[in-house]
Every structure is written in C-alpha cells, then in structure tokens.
C-alpha cells in the first residue's frame, strides 16, 4: 500500500511540475521590442492592408475584435509560433517604467522579440528611453483576450 501511495505522490508531483513548466513557457523577461508602422486606425484595422501574417485566419474577424487591442508582431523566445500565436494576447510591461498594456498578435517578426505597432510602443515608452534607444526592453506574458 505504501508503494502505491508513493507512486501516486510521484505522479502528482510530476504533473504539477509539467503544469508549472508550461505556464513558465508562456512568458518571457527582458525581451527586445521594436516598433512597426501598422497604424491600424489609418487602414480601418484591415489586416490584409497591413500585410499581416495572421490576415489569413483573422482578417474577417469583426471590427470590434480587430480594434480591441493594439497590434504586435510576435517572435518572442517563449510561446506559440506561426498560426498558433495569431489572435492571442500578451500583457507587455516596459521594464524601465512598469507601464503595461495588452496587445493582440497579428503578425510574425524576426527580431527575436516583439514588433509593436508604433502607437503601442509610444504608449509604453512613457519616459522616451525606447525612442532614444530605438527599442524597449519588455516582459510579456500570454493572457486571455476575453473575446
């Protein structure tokens, strides 16, 4: 009986460890974030007009869905890639100021981090350091978009 209980305890601890590892894989710290001139307000939040990677799957979503959050391209070190990341949301925090916002992934990038819409970048860059450096250092975590 004691062996069975030890086995169950080991299995439970393994499952808990796996869940914690999966949760950790959905966030990253000290990530480089640049900006892109999507300016969705000027193109009626049209993912096709922006030539966004995720347009294939998300361009026909309701306007309210496309407007709900600022846009970003995602190529961060942790989390899903490609189509699996499309439409997902990130809570992004400027590590220098603590300023946070939620963004929606609409595109891919190749800078190893995030490529935020310029409006989102400016919203996070409350002290101007990102503009001066040409990039921000941010933390991100995948969050529920509440759609």
Swiss-Prot record:
PROSITE patterns in UniProt: BARWIN_1 (PS00771), BARWIN_2 (PS00772), BARWIN_3 (PS51174)
S-S bonds: 54-86, 75-109, 89-145
Gene3D superfamilies in the cross-refs: RlpA-like domain (2.40.40.10)
Annotated Barwin domain residues: 26-147
One of the GO BP terms on file: defense response to bacterium
Subcellular location, record wording: Secreted, Cell wall
Induction of its expression: By TMV infection.
Top-level taxon of the source organism: Eukaryota
InterPro entries associated with the record: Barwin_CS, Barwin_dom, PR4, RlpA-like_sf
GO MF annotations in UniProt: RNA nuclease activity
Keywords: Cell wall, Disulfide bond, Pathogenesis-related protein, Plant defense, Secreted, Signal
Signal peptide positions on this chain: 1-25
GO cellular component, one term: extracellular region
Name by which UniProt lists this protein: Pathogenesis-related protein PR-4A
Organism: Nicotiana tabacum (Common tobacco)
